Amino acid sequence: MRAFEFWDTSPDQPDWRARLLQPLGMLYAQATAWRIAQKPGVRYGVPVICIGNLNAGGTGKTPTVIALVERLAARGITPHVVSRGYGGRLSGPLTVLPRQHSADQVGDEPLLLAAFCQVHVARDRGLGVELAVRAGAEVVLLDDGFQNPGVHKDLSIVVVNARKGFGNGLCLPAGPLREPVSAGLARADLVISIGSASDQSCFRQNWAAVLSQPYADKNATFQRDSVLPVLCGVMTPLQTGMDWSGERVMAFAGIGDPEKFFETLRALGADVVQQESLQDHQPLTPRLMRRLAQKAQQSGAQMVTTEKDAVRLPPGFRDQVLTLPVRLNLENWSVIDSAVDRLFENLDTRS
């Protein structure tokens, strides 16, 4: 989905275009609330951890899912991911097979995640969870299903880009939100805010009022009446042995925040002589790649992109483009570790 600049204005001073579209945003919020309230989510016999967001578009969910997969696996727990498969044409339910499926079939995010654990794509999330359980999942990570009411969530994590926060605080199309912040956080168990220390400080300052109010925990995971836990995380480049210092690069990215990717390259010492921001999930057609390759050649630069974009590269260009992988580092895993422990305790109690 295309993001508009006026979505990122201060929530205290929305742009005139946002104010003009605000009645439509209110209708969107009402429709979301109605859909969520229609029926209770179905339980499938294993804990379900939802990783979602309030904003439309990318906020760092995929790196968060990867971090959770690795954390759970390190504890001896077998996680499977269930995804809608945004950008793919197959409706599922199916298990992603990296050597057989392509991004245009199952979506770029499921194809990337399949390198870390079993991933199941299903337009009907419930059918996807059923498939995961039959395949041996001990816990299911529901990728981007926070506003989907069909599956019961035992733990709901809202991911937010600390730099952008919740934008102007308004719902689509007046702002970037799928639902009002207060309504979404009332169903969340914790928030993961991703960004630099300065971005984290600005996020907490701009959204202090809504983050500091107490929320009743409807899922009874934390049994808390305190404020919502907010965990801080930062994206760090994965050490691959590549020395980026002085490397002339033509960087392109079709993710939620391409500028963050370009900044990471510069921080590593790369000379970003050309950069191109693409739409999130934008198809990397041969025509587009030929144009980017020509720009790189004219600049004497090496093409480089993100892991998520790399899985969408046409076969003829895969050996021409370098990839810079990043991973999410959380400052404190103890809150999530304790929550996971309680999930399995609650499961034992129900059974």
Regions found by a protein language model. Give the residues of each.
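A transmembrane-helix-recognition feature enriched in membrane-embedded lipid enzymes
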Residues: 2-48
